Amino acid sequence: MAGNRLVPRYAHTDGLTRLAYTRDGKFLLTVGSNQVIRKFQVGSDEEPDSIDNHQDPITGIAVAENYFCTCSEDATVCVYPIDSPTEHTLLARTTLPIRDVAYSVDGNWIAIASDETAVKVVSSTDSSQIFSLRPAKASNKHVTYSPNGNFLAVSSCNGILYFYDTQTRELIKFLTNTIASLEAESEICSKAAWHPKNGTFAVASTDHFVSVISPDDWLPLYKLLPKENHSGVTDISWSSNGMYIAASFKKGGILIWDTQSHEVVVELPYSTVVALAWQPFENVLSFTTNQGILYSCPDVIPKSILKEENDPTKPLTSSKSKNRTSKELDDLFGSDDEQSQNVNDLDGNSANEENEFINHDGLDSSLDLDGDSYMVDENDLNLAKKRKQKALIDRTTTIENGSSKRRLLQASIHKPVHTGSTPWQGNRRYLCLNLVGFIWTVQQDAEHNTITVEFHDETTHRKYHFVDDQKFEMACLDHEGALYASPATESSPGVIYYKAHVDWSRKSEWAMALPMENESPVTISLSSSVVLVCTSAGYVRVFSRQGFPISIHRSKHLPFVACSSFQDTIITIANDGLSSDGNSRLVYSIEDISRDEMLQTGDGVALPPQGTLESVFFSDVGDPYIYDSTGVLLVLMHWRIPGQAKWIPVLDTNELERRKSRQESYWPVTVADNQFHCILLKGASRYPYFPRPMFTEFDFRIPCNTNNPDASTSVPVLEELQLRNKLFLTLLEDSIGDGDVTEDEKISIARLEANIDKALLQLIQKACLEERIERVYELTKTLRRTTSIAAAQKIALHHSLTNVAEKIGNLLSNV
């Protein structure tokens, strides 16, 4: 049956999947990144039961006699009765995403591996019974119990395999140079897969073999050699009789070995497999892919070679392993001296501190993540404690001439806007969301939150987490690092904290307490050159990326609403009295930090009547944009020339064709490649939520006329097209200014001029057909290239419009 095509069952969406059979083999359970549990009845073609409980991708599943449990990136472990899985129980919660769970043999305990440094072990019936194992300052990827109940194996992300005695809870052995060092989210497997009967275990070794190791002497019994072009083990699973072992590979498919002959007996050419499970007591192998597809292969071992039971007389340790030289053993596991030293130094503790590996604190105990590296200096904190708490931003709204006037002015103050952030939804919120990635925070308790930083391009940077003792309320993210800010409190000052993504020495990490009494960050921004902080004290503070102060000035307009930055250019937006409709009037200022030059000062932000500001940002080429509450995107043109700047609408999302048939809105992200990048919000939703939202891009369409999208060459479409390209050309020419023009810029200018003239010539053609002489001549005068004017003359002559052709000829002679 292994050679026949298997029937796929689409269980989940793309992403990591896991599966497990119940111990009686009657049901097959799968989990995946779409937060859904599927319960398949073995041998039935009926639709599986679906259980939707977790908020984030499910990363692991384990099965006991009558129950099963799941874990998720939402940092929870839930337990379900197999017979009625909808009646789930939330058993445990950690501070960071959970990667794996495992039941003890008797089903009384559940081990939890997470991005925390501690492995938690919780009673499956009483969540108050819990203890922690702390092997090292690294997160953990897998946990597995030996079938005899003696050992708990922990696979750490640092490439060390730890073994604990389940009775004494003591660390009894750790193996180095055995498994690979991996990221927590990696599909590659580093778990210890236990033989169902004889006590040995298999691992994907660092040399790309599958090694079978005996805990009697912790030496490899034998190694299973994969076929050529097979690499990257994603899972390992033993058959229920222990006679066969299957391994899935990231490249190459699935291989099954006979554990006595050590030869490959079955090869299944299925790619992207990430999880394997043998059906108990049956010759059936099931597996899932990272595309969410489930396959089951009956009679996977051909009956002609099928072996029913392992030879009970076969010794656990081969003579070959007993005859290894001391050098070979040192190469495999390190010398005895190194082992002894590593045990002593495993968590930075001396030998007499090894009992600290066992921690009986609860799940929400503080983690030793070196989080104090960005804490504020003690002197600053002591100074802040002596200060009396005062009102921050709302202080500016106080008027002492009557409560009605106070209410009027308070209503007119535009609230601060931080581009890319969302309000709290439950216990989590996005601090920053842009084209680089996401930063979100999760409330844990009154003392701290946890922050996760994730990237769209995981090949550049990997996702990471840290414990947030400052309870940051704002963040900015770019390719090099992240900027955070927290407000002043009664006991501490406002804090600015910068953290580089890749900085093992932490020399690029810095923190700063704002010096003024009760001074809080109101809005912040991060560019490739500067850190910008606008505060409740009215100061615009500019720092270098290394925390060196560059400039400071007090704004003429308060309180601040928003800010943004691009290279050495910054824009700040603030309140400035009331507009004619009774709402707050917003003004902006633009400054070139490198030249210490104010380009625009106190000019108005072009908001519609009763409208508010939703977002402000620079595009990928450095032009300022705003997005207002009515769904209109505007760009600031001529902003480098003092007094000449004006806001040009480039897209009205209310006029999008898709908007006519859908109830949706658009949450702004940025502008890149002359496209509006946003997140679609369905129904009455105002903000994106979890799981991670997808981006959508819209081309600009200047609202200059009634556009008909069904006719790409209609007059309204062509009129808008030439106007849009003219805008792009103006923005490009403004950015060049009096500087030298590069070859790429020359090419871009020529392309835009050609696009403008092409649209105009099509309009001239239509005007000639309608014999609109004055319009033909008017359009011809706007052409930019001599060749285009000559083409317009030919079009006029083609339509026998000799008078206008003569006028066009006069234009040519004057060019």
Curated annotation (Swiss-Prot):
Top-rank taxon: Eukaryota
Pfam family, one: Mcl1_mid
Compositional bias ranges of the Polar residues kind: 340-352
WD repeat copies, ranges: 11-50, 53-90, 93-132, 135-174, 228-267, 517-553
Keyword Cytoplasm listed: no
Gene Ontology MF term list: chromatin binding
Annotated localization: Nucleus; Chromosome
GO biological process: DNA damage response; DNA repair; DNA replication-dependent chromatin assembly; DNA-templated DNA replication; mitotic cell cycle; Okazaki fragment processing involved in mitotic DNA replication
SMART domains: WD40
A GO cellular component annotation in the UniProt record: nuclear replication fork
Coiled-coil boundaries: none
InterPro entries: WD40/YVTN_repeat-like_dom_sf, WD40_repeat_dom_sf, WD40_rpt, WDHD1/CFT4_beta-prop_2nd, WDHD1/CFT4_hel
Keyword DNA damage annotated: yes
Oligomer status and interactors: Interacts with pof3 and pol1.
PANTHER family from the UniProt entry: WD REPEAT AND HMG-BOX DNA BINDING PROTEIN, WD REPEAT AND HMG-BOX DNA-BINDING PROTEIN 1
Role description: Has a role in regulating DNA replication complexes. Acts as a regulator of post DNA replication initiation. Associates with chromatin during G1 and S phases of mitosis. Required for the transcriptional repression of the outer repeats of the centromeric region. Acts as a polymerase alpha replication accessory factor and is important for S-phase DNA damage survival. Plays a role in lagging-strand synthesis and Ozaki fragment processing, in addition to DNA repair.
Listed name of the protein: Minichromosome loss protein 1
Organism: Schizosaccharomyces pombe (strain 972 / ATCC 24843) (Fission yeast)
